[in-house]
Regions:
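Alpha-helical structural signal in soluble globular domains
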Residues: 1, 42, 46, 63, ...
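Acidic, low-complexity intrinsically disordered segments
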Residues: 1-167
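Radical SAM enzyme core and accessory elements
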Residues: 2-7, 22, 116-118, 304-306, ...
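Structured beta->alpha junctions
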Residues: 28, 32, 56, 72, ...
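Structural detector of well-ordered beta-strand residues that form the stable sheet scaffold
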Residues: 51, 72, 95-96, 197-199, ...
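Flexible glycine/acidic-rich beta-alpha junction loops that bind and position SAM and/or redox cofactors
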Residues: 63, 179-180, 232-237, 267-275, ...
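Structural recognition of alpha->loop->beta junctions
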Residues: 63-81, 213-223, 279-294
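Radical SAM [4Fe-4S] cluster-binding motif and immediate context
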Residues: 109-262, 267-269, 273-274, 278-282
Length: 402
């Protein structure tokens, strides 16, 4: 098919409203859904057909369909080409669903050249697997994407080789979901002399062979979802595998192998009391998490968590633009929404004080310039939260109720 493709990332530039195109496709996450719908409505009013896809339309297809000529539900490797063929033939359907037998083998390499590399910290990203074997109640992955998928290791290696880069980031949600696959992948990566980072679970510390292979393959940093220090909260969210893990041992094992940790924690579980913020920050400082991140529990639509809170009448708003992990969109069980918001902000600021950064990085003994730079970036974020997102909506909600 002879087609000109223009790719626009609204994270770095706004979409020109006078854009001239035969067909427009918009991919939306929940936090960007209102903006996506607004753009779709605008271009449709100009007579340009619009297709909506991505995780949010996959979670709430009927809602998305109100703003589109067609929607793509699920992954689009097979459905998008079929949609384009149908469009050219004048027979585009209203909905395209992911093939349950979708395979990630022999796919074309991503067109990274369509994005302006100067606007990104790195373009060196690759994906080996999709999905996750776990079913955490707050996570959209089981609801949106279904079964886990894998690219053949040979395809992943070929993609990396054609990028001609020595540093890269794996975007996989859980790179070790299939341990045998992960070991095969790490063995091949070791021959490429790379340095890489990625996402996984605390379960990586259960297997010394796997952890050693990751280190030898060039792993220098991993994002781990600790989520909570409370066994009750972990059970509540169906993350019981974390309950079998000694967090102190996880950090020690990774640091011993020169692997830095981006540790992610969530506030707002039903078992969380107002002292959860100080307890979590104390733990982060005690074990020297290299790059901590905090999020507010967010009940994304169509997840088990959303259905529970909806049934209990605890959803505070359906303004999807607030569903970004930094707004309070549900009524917490043991504190007010305002307390949850202010406690999260306090945790960010306390963790990223200069002395806190120095203590964590010096004691972890992983000396990487990128870690220091990332901590300074998060310090800026922590001290300017109100400019990064509209954090006063709970205050306005409180005033409206008065």
């Amino acid at each position: 098919m002879d087609a000109e493709v223009i790719l626009i990332d609204e994270g770095i530039t706004e979409t020109p409203l006078d854009l001239d195109a035969d067909l427009i496709g918009i991919s939306a996450i929940t936090g960007t859904a209102p903006r996506s719908y607004s753009l779709a409505d605008h271009f449709r009013s100009r007579g340009i057909p619009v297709v909506l896809g991505g995780v949010h339309p996959t979670l709430v297809p009927q809602e998305a369909a109100e703003h589109a000529d067609s929607i793509v539900v699920g992954y689009a490797e097979q459905t998008w080409p079929q949609l384009l063929r149908d469009f050219v033939g004048g027979a585009m359907r209203e909905r395209y669903d992911q093939d349950p037998n979708l395979s990630l083998a022999d796919l074309p390499f991503p067109r990274r050249d369509l994005l302006p590399s100067r606007h990104y910290v790195t373009m060196n990203t690759v994906e080996a697997t999709r999905g996750c074997i776990h079913s955490c109640r707050f996570c959209v992955v089981p609801s949106a994407w279904g079964r886990p998928l894998q690219r053949p290791v040979g395809d992943v290696v070929a993609d990396i080789k054609q990028m001609r880069m020595r540093r890269l980031i794996f975007l996989d949600l859980n790179l070790i979901a299939d341990v045998d696959y992960a070991k095969e992948l790490f063995t091949e990566l070791a021959t490429l002399k790379l340095k890489w980072g990625g996402l996984t679970t605390t379960m990586i510390a259960w297997d010394d062979e796997l952890l050693d292979l990751a280190a030898r393959s060039g792993c220098r940093g991993l994002l781990l979802g600790f989520e909570s220090l409370s066994r009750g909260s972990l059970a509540e969210t169906r993350k019981s595998f974390n309950m079998r893990t000694d967090y102190y041992d996880v950090v020690r094992r990774l640091h011993e192998r020169g692997i830095s940790i981006m540790g992610c924690f969530v506030f707002g579980f039903d078992g969380d009391t107002p002292d959860v913020f100080e307890q979590t920050v104390d733990f982060v400082m005690d074990v020297n998490i290299d790059l901590p991140r905090y999020a507010i529990l967010t009940p994304f639509p169509s997840t088990p968590l959303f259905r529970q809170l909806e049934n209990e009448g605890r959803i505070l708003t359906r303004d999807w633009s607030l569903y970004d992990g930094q707004h309070v969109v549900h009524e917490p069980m043991q504190m007010s929404p305002e307390w949850l918001l202010s406690g999260t902000e306090w945790a960010w600021k306390r963790t990223y004080e200069h002395r806190s950064i120095a203590k964590r990085l010096l004691c972890s003994r992983i000396q990487m310039p990128t870690l220091y730079a990332a901590n300074l970036g998060y310090r800026f974020y922590a001290n300017n939260l109100s400019t990064f997102y509209n954090c006063d909506w709970v205050v306005r909600r409180e005033r409206a109720a008065a």
